[in-house]
Amino acid sequence: LQQHWQQLYETSETLLKINDYERIVLVKNYVCPAIAIISKSLEHDEQMFRMVYDALPLKEGETEPMMNIVAWRANDTFISVVFPRYKHRPDCYFAEKEQQFLVSPGSLDMAGLMILPREIDFERITPTLAEHIMREVSLSDEAMHEVIKHICQHNVSSWKQEPTVSVGIVSAEKIHFRLNGSYLIDGELITGEQTVEYSKGEILWQSAYLRELVFTPKDQESSFSLDDVTIGLNFHWERKEVQTFLGTLHLIVDNGKIYAINELPVEEYLTSVISSEMSATSSLELLKAHAVISRSWLLAQIEKRKSLGKGTEHQEVSTVRTDNELVRWFDREDHTLFDVCADDHCQRYQGITKATSPHVKMAIDATRGQVLFSEGSICDARFSKCCGGISEEFQYCWENIRKPYLLSVEDKAPLGSVPTMDLTDEEAAREWILSSPEAFCNTHDGVVLGQVLNNYDQETQDFYRWTVEFTQAGLSALIAQKTGIDFGEIKNLVPLSRGKSGRIYRMRIEGTKLSYVIGKELEIRRALSESHLYSSAFVVDSYDIVNGVPQHFRLTGAGWGHGVGLCQIGAAMMGEKGYDYQQILYHYYKNAEVRRLYE
């Protein structure tokens, strides 16, 4: 264990982080479950050991949990590895004749130095048997899952006061900014126009080469303005503008660029986010619900970043490809240099560039510190524009994990109702999509839609049910362009698998040259639109058949977006109907509760 520690540590998963140097990690690539405590001080070492100790199961009749511990010192760092145990001795200890091995693993055995009192056992034991013995006396995977969950809860419960969030604003080889007010750097007051440039692997500022720069505001009113901040990245409204921010400006170097990071209190950040994403006309209860959702997602991201450690940001993409099928899902980008980015890929954050709505400030203050909780963890609170009448479940859009708080519900009273129709069935899905059943999000009320949609999106109000027409030439060219596959002429689009909301997550494209299966829902939406099809909850009708090939196609669909979690249009209507924010949240997030983490 000690010999290979550096390699094991690099592949470990952080469960709890005290600071950049002290943490609790799960050792992942070892023969048996192990938890390591990395510390530099006696105080933190005791604190983290107590967290691990309290997380371990206690057997009936025992006074303390079973474990082995191996500890050593590396320079000024103390490393303690805890091996949670299920039992004292393996079954082979009590076996008879040649089946017996007198092995009773202790701390050194669990750390990789197995001691056998009998020479006959020493000569006969194999690496496979040794591994089996260590696994047998250790906690099971299920028991370890509970231990890990218990340790991770300390990340949340330790937030007795408002946390700080770090937001990546812009990255470039050269950044120009203006300090509007006095900022401290190394005890010196700085103000006015500034330029930093990437040079020789460092930041060049005022003729000095530095690895990082931290500009700390002298007072709460001081702000800084960054030039050339991109908004709407990869969307049709993409552009650059000057944006102004409160809080600390942190400049760091990574991968040949300088990153400008804004560090500020969470509640201040949320006030800007909700003001940017929601209309000033939104009802107070809708704004409260969105404040809780945004805060939940943000704090979950902060915790996720702790487990990722430092490095270059990446997007989570999973692909399953065979000769005749491509199933791919995209999740939000994971940043490791900062907690979240400032663009729509995370949450739209524009500092104090745009006016803050007093209505939003009221909603933020009313829900201060509140998040959605489920099974001891902060909820990954997803949302979309319009569910189409029934919300979708997580596993049909992203990773094949069923999240207990992201279950399918009918978007109507009684709240949180399980769908009465099985929309995974093709006939039922067709009947549902071609009808217009009652739902909170089934509305053309301009006042309600104006709470959720910007002016551009309100040019059409056909979100609950919509149609798209294609010619044969248009559809075959579009699919070839978007997939990179020449199908020839398109003969059919065949739904193979649907989720609980009727959204297709596996679809076969049949052409005159070949057939191919694609998924999940976003991959399907991308293949059938220049940007994104409203949703993958659609049925296909083809007509004007010539030699077995349709000349026209009509897609009739339901909803806008992935449909998982809160339905924004539905939630806006609920607010208009008098439901409060907790009723709205509990309707869309089953098995969750609203909990206040800090005052």
Regions found by a protein language model. Name each.
Residues L1-N155:
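HIT superfamily nucleotide-processing domains
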Residues I151-E599:
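Conserved, single-site charged/polar hotspot
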